[in-house]
Structures are given as C-alpha cells and as structure tokens.
Amino acid sequence: SMVIQLGHQILDGKAPTLFEGSDQILRDFINIEDVVQANIKACNPKENGTYNVGTSTPRSFQAIADILQAELGTDLGTNYIKNPYDGYQMHTQADISTSQTNLGFEPVVSLEEGIKAYISDIKRLHSTDIS
C-alpha cells in the first residue's frame, strides 16, 4: 500500500517520494474498518443495488506523507519526482449518498486515525526480513 511504502521510506531515513503536485492529487482514502462495516451493512440493505464505499472526503498523497512524518516523529521533507503518466487521474471522490440512505453507512475512521493505528504494523513490517 502507499502508506506502507511511504512509511518504509521514512523509517529508512529517506524523504518520502511523491509526484510533483501531490498536494493537488486527491483520492478518497478509506480505512479497512469502514469497508468492513459497509459490507456488513450491505447484507441487509433497504434496497438491493450497487453501493459506493468511501469517505466522500478526498485527501492528497501529500497529506499521507505529512501524517506519517508527524506520527513517526520525523521532518525529512518530501522528494518530488516528475509524474511519468499522461492522463493521470488527479481527483477521485466517492458519492456515498446511496450507501448512507440505503445501508445506513457512515465512515468513522479519519485518515489521521487510520494511519496512527497502522504505525505499529508499518514498523513491524519494516523490521521483518522477507527475503
């Protein structure tokens, strides 16, 4: 995952590497705990259908790097590289209104809370030899 990759770069003492303009590249990041709750609620919907699961709040890749550095107690800056992809999608945001109405789904884990809860696993995975 992006969070693990950036976390491992930081734990290696390196500035996290992101595309130039990463403060403007937005994604609708969601915590797995919220995804599980949405799936449980989808077992008994008010109406059958296809449901979007997300937070409806897009956040930047830069925000992930900044939160990780704050949680890991570092200030390594950010290493920016040119984005090599033409037509790179700059913004995703889930419309969860139908999920809210028909499933009673509401995301509860913020990006900050999710990353904070993940720090011990990032450190554990970083120290694990998988070769």
Model-derived features: where do they sit?
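Residues that recognize and position ribonucleotide moieties
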Residues: D28, T57, T92
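NAD(P)-dependent short-chain dehydrogenase/reductase
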Residues: S1-V36, I40-C43, D66-E71
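C-terminal "lid/loop" region of Rossmann-like NAD(P)-dependent oxidoreductases
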Residues: E20-S22, T50-Y51, S60-D66, G73-H91, ...
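Core catalytic loop region at the nicotinamide-binding pocket of NAD(P)H-dependent oxidoreductases
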Residues: A15-L18, A42-V53, L76, H126-S131
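Conserved C-terminal active-site "lid" loop/helix of NAD(P)H-dependent oxidoreductases
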Residues: I32, Q62, P84-E106, S110-E113, ...
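Residues within well-ordered alpha-helical secondary structure of globular protein domains
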Residues: D12, K41, A70, F105, ...
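Amphipathic terminal alpha-helices
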Residues: L111-S131
